[in-house]
């Protein structure tokens, strides 16, 4: 359950959705993507029981540790919401993942390296990162068209250097699941590096 907010809804409806997925042949567990401000205590207690019987990882869309950035991109939650959600989830013995976007407006190289140290202080098990991508039809794409000077889009070598610096400031036990993302070419405005994910990983 990766797209959208997969913990939003009535508890019984969410239970039915998860349990239906677990009945599918060859499904060996659940990875549930959600927002840090959308995990109720009741659902967390239910998931604490689920993880006793199957693989379970809850992944939070953190995006940034900077509250000014979170307001700028209209996320509707704070970094403290992330800290609380991650600590509550990990405290239940549930594997806990995070997702961040590198290169959001106003965040410089040194800010992002500091972000890695900040994230290392919370009990994440896994982390996914990817570069800021401007997608056609989005509010941010419109903002880029109006004020491109507000955006710094990394070229591939610059982003590789950033990722290396970022990793060096992460806890060594964090499992890194992704360094880069690849949007459909017909939707992508920038940056267009012309690299497949595996090609980027090889260069890292």
Model-derived features: positions:
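Active-site glycine- and acidic-residue-rich loops that bind
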Residues: 37-41, 75, 104-116, 153-160
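Short amphipathic alpha-helices and their capping/turn segments at secondary-structure boundaries
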Residues: 39-55, 83-84, 113-123, 168
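Conserved strand-turn element in the central/C-terminal portion of the radical SAM core barrel
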Residues: 67, 89-111, 131-136, 143-153, ...
């Amino acid at each position: 359950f990766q797209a959208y907010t997969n913990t939003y809804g009535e508890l019984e409806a969410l239970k039915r959705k998860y349990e239906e997925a677990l009945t599918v042949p060859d499904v060996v567990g659940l990875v549930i993507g959600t927002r840090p401000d959308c995990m109720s205590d009741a659902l967390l207690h239910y998931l604490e029981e689920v993880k006793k019987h199957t693989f379970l990882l809850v992944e939070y869309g953190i995006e940034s540790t900077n509250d000014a950035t979170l307001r700028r991109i209209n996320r509707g939650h704070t970094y403290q919401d992330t800290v609380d959600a991650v600590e509550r989830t990990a405290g239940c013995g549930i594997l806990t993942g995070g997702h961040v976007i590198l290169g959001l407006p106003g965040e410089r190289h040194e800010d992002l390296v500091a972000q890695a140290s900040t994230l290392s202080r919370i009990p994440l098990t896994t982390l996914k990162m990817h570069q800021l991508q401007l997608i056609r039809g989005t509010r941010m794409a419109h903002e880029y068209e109006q004020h491109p000077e507000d955006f710094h889009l990394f070229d591939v070598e610059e982003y590789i250097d950033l990722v290396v610096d970022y990793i060096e400031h992460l806890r060594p036990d964090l499992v890194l699941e992704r360094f880069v993302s690849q949007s459909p070419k017909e939707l992508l405005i920038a940056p267009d590096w012309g690299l497949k994910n595996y090609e980027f990983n090889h260069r890292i």
